[in-house]
């Protein structure tokens, strides 16, 4: 089966669009919108790497069943998370689904400044901490996205998104918000980072 990531990259190449450019981001956003929700298919994508234990700075995807879902106003069952650090019973992470796609792209562009290298390959990670995010104005978008995830409530394999696919992954329609729509969540998030 052809990888979704491969198909999107191939179209950009055919159109002469350079990888990791603004034009590539716009093309990916447009094409992914046509695809519709991709949650189940993405877990089978060959370009993602299964990780038993992800590292701090990895971008990861997984199915999540929150411990306190009955009291949460809304939650995402398929987070796209950048792992920030360890936490009691799990880890702290930035779930990018809490931002609308255009803001995700802006935020990712800022976060790329923290990449451990500019190769954007399997070894590349984000080098971020809560204190860095909190202290730096350009990282203000992290506020509504910063979550505590409990390991025992992860109900699928953890899939690592390699750095070469970060710009594509942020546009995939994999969010699975419960109780409220994506749009509602994004409006609430905007109140936190404005």
What do these predicted ranges mean?
Residues 89-97:
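Short, solvent-exposed secondary-structure boundary/capping segments
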């Amino acid at each position: 089966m052809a990888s979704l990531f491969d198909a999107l990259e191939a179209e950009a190449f055919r159109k002469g669009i350079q990888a990791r450019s603004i034009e590539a981001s716009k093309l990916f956003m447009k094409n992914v919108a046509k695809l519709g929700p991709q949650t189940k298919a993405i877990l089978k994508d060959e370009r993602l790497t299964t990780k038993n234990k992800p590292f701090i700075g990895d971008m990861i995807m997984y199915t999540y069943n929150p411990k306190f879902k009955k009291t949460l106003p809304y939650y995402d069952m398929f987070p796209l998370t950048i792992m920030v650090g360890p936490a009691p019973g799990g880890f702290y992470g930035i779930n990018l689904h809490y931002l609308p796609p255009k803001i995700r792209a802006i935020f990712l562009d800022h976060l790329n400044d923290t990449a451990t290298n500019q190769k954007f390959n399997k070894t590349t990670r984000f080098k971020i901490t809560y204190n860095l995010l909190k202290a730096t104005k350009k990282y203000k978008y992290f506020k509504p996205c910063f979550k505590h995830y409990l390991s025992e409530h992860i109900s699928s394999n953890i899939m690592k998104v390699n750095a070469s696919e970060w710009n594509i992954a942020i546009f995939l329609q994999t969010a699975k918000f419960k109780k409220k729509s994506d749009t509602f969540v994004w409006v609430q998030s905007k109140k936190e980072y404005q």
